[in-house]
From Swiss-Prot:
Domain Phosphagen kinase C-terminal as annotated: residue spans: 21-242
Classification via SUPFAM superfamilies: Glutamine synthetase/guanido kinase
Protein residues bound to ATP: 24-28, 79, 113, 164-168, 195-200
Keywords assigned by UniProt, alphabetized: ATP-binding, Kinase, Nucleotide-binding, Transferase
GO MF annotation, one: protein kinase activity
Functional summary from the UniProt entry: Catalyzes the specific phosphorylation of arginine residues in proteins.
Family: Belongs to the ATP:guanido phosphotransferase family.
InterPro entries, per the entry: Arg_Kinase (IPR023660), ATP-guanido_PTrfase (IPR000749), ATP-guanido_PTrfase_cat (IPR022414), Gln_synth/guanido_kin_cat_dom (IPR014746)
EC numbers, comma separated: 2.7.14.1
GO cellular component labels: extracellular space
Name of the protein this chain belongs to: Protein-arginine kinase
Reaction it catalyzes: L-arginyl-[protein] + ATP = N(omega)-phospho-L-arginyl-[protein] + ADP + H(+)
């Protein structure tokens, strides 16, 4: 297993429920050890070693102080560690399974952050996997837990279940019909948060949004997941209605937009990350509308992941200036799209 190879994690490679709109679902559990200090002002490598001993050979341990900055960036682009861990966690580490659908960050903001990812809208599957791992760890180690407040975490907004449930969605229909603002306002009024593809601190871009719960205290994990699932089902329905309306009323204009983006990516020699991401979003839109029978959702995920800066540096085998990065990105995109 080489996590730094250019390959998709299982949750990006496999099909899932409602995956014409939903790219992935994720459950993250924040936990701290009973007898260790948190928030983590002074990171201790022995905490990593003690937790890692609990897991068997089905997981590999990657310590942040033993890998390069490029390798850390690759893990961020694959959503296996957070940007916070890449930049701030000198004695942090991550435990990964072979399918890369389970990632356990150690010494991030909390001692453990267990995250499980699934393709499509499968929050309950992700929750079941996360709770199974959580229960296994709790049999071996004592968590910081309060009868009144629940699991104690470094950030007060995580106290209670310590759980963040999130769903990544592609909403070009709602963006194009200019209904996205009212939808986001409705989501927020229900107590959920809308962010960009890399979660906290990132802004939505290229029609991709991450929706997650805000409340972790006073509800069970299952109740939070059920609430978010119901919200997502409404968003999915509205996005599909918007797509159908656009296809019926503006078919030629929509085809023109999608095929222009396809022509751009098939023929470009220099392309920025934003221009590529916007064009990839258009083509994914076209795939879901039935304009491209030869392009799979898996190929779309390859385009998104392998056009990111760290993967391009890995492809080139060296650091690059801005122009070189744009040239390599164009080459990689042409190769992926041309591989039928």
């Amino acid at each position: 297993m080489n996590v730094f190879e250019p390959r998709l994690s299982s949750w990006l490679e496999n099909a899932g429920d409602d995956d014409d709109v939903v790219l992935s679902s994720r459950i993250r559990l924040a936990r701290n050890l009973k007898d260790e200090q948190f928030p983590i002002y002074e990171q201790k490598e022995e905490i990593v070693d003690n937790i890692a001993e609990v897991f068997d050979d089905n997981f590999i341990l990657i310590k942040m102080n033993q890998i390069s900055l490029l390798q850390k960036a690759l893990l961020v682009e694959k959503h296996l560690i957070s940007p916070y861990m890449m930049n701030k966690s000198e004695y942090g580490a991550v435990l990964l399974n072979e399918e890369e659908n389970v990632s356990i960050m150690l010494n991030e903001e909390d001692h453990l952050r267990i995250q499980c990812m699934t393709p499509g809208l499968r929050l309950f599957d992700a929750l079941e996997a996360a709770l199974q791992i959580d229960g296994y760890v709790e049999e071996k180690l004592s968590y910081a837990f309060d009868k009144e407040f629940g699991y104690l975490t470094s950030c007060v907004t995580n106290i209670g279940t310590g759980m963040r449930a999130s769903v990544m969605v592609h909403l070009p229909g709602l963006v194009t019909t200019k209904r996205i603002k009212s939808v986001i306002e409705a989501i927020r009024s229900l107590g959920f948060v809308v962010r960009g593809i890399y979660g906290e601190g990132s802004m939505p871009a290229s029609n991709i949004f991450q929706v997650s719960n805000q409340v972790t205290l006073g509800k069970t994990e299952a109740e939070i997941v059920e609430d978010l699932t119901q919200v997502m089902e409404q968003i999915i329905m509205q996005e599909r209605v918007a797509r159908t309306t656009l296809k019926q009323k503006f078919h030629i204009a929509l085809e023109d937009r999608v095929f222009r983006s396809y022509g751009l990516l098939m023929n470009c020699r220099i392309i920025s990350m934003k221009e590529a991401a916007d064009a990839i979003s258009d083509i994914r839109f076209g795939v879901e509308l039935g304009f491209f029978e030869h392009i799979s959702r898996q190929k779309m995920n390859e385009l998104v992941l392998f056009s990111q800066p760290a993967f391009l540096r890995r492809e080139a085998g060296r650091d690059m200036d801005e122009l070189e990065e744009k040239v390599i990105r164009a080459k990689v995109i042409r190769e992926i799209l041309g591989d039928k």
